[in-house]
Amino acid sequence: MTVRDGTEQRRRVVVVEDDEDIAELLTDILDAEGFAPVAVSDAAGLDRELGQRPDLIVLDLRLTRGGADKIMSSLRSRGLGDVPILLLSAASDLPDRAKELGVTSFLAKPFELEDFIVLVRRLL
């Protein structure tokens, strides 16, 4: 883990995940690594958070409400298509879906937290 001295701007990461335990785990690790994470559970929650432009969006592919397709469409229509998107899923078709959706990168669940942080840093 990296220790920050608090003098730099924390990069804003929005985690879109409807499993509360996973959302909490991801936001805790992001916060510990010096990012400014916020978790939302669906497309409506993400819409509320887009007033402040995120530096990265971590998106669960299989949301129960307002799926990834809807979210990607909404981001593009709002002029946020250039915000990096990290897609997470345990789905066997993850590489194909990631390509279809046009996300920046993807990570298959389950994953090691260190791999997650390395990928987040690379995307930022």
Which stretches of residues belong to each language-model region?
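Alpha4 helix (beta4-alpha4-beta5 surface) of REC/receiver domains from two-component response regulators
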Residues: K70, A91-L107, V118
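Acidic, metal-coordinating helix/loop segments flanking the phosphotransfer/catalytic sites
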Residues: A39-L56
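His-Asp phosphorelay/catalytic-motif detector in bacterial-type signaling
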Residues: R53, G79-P84
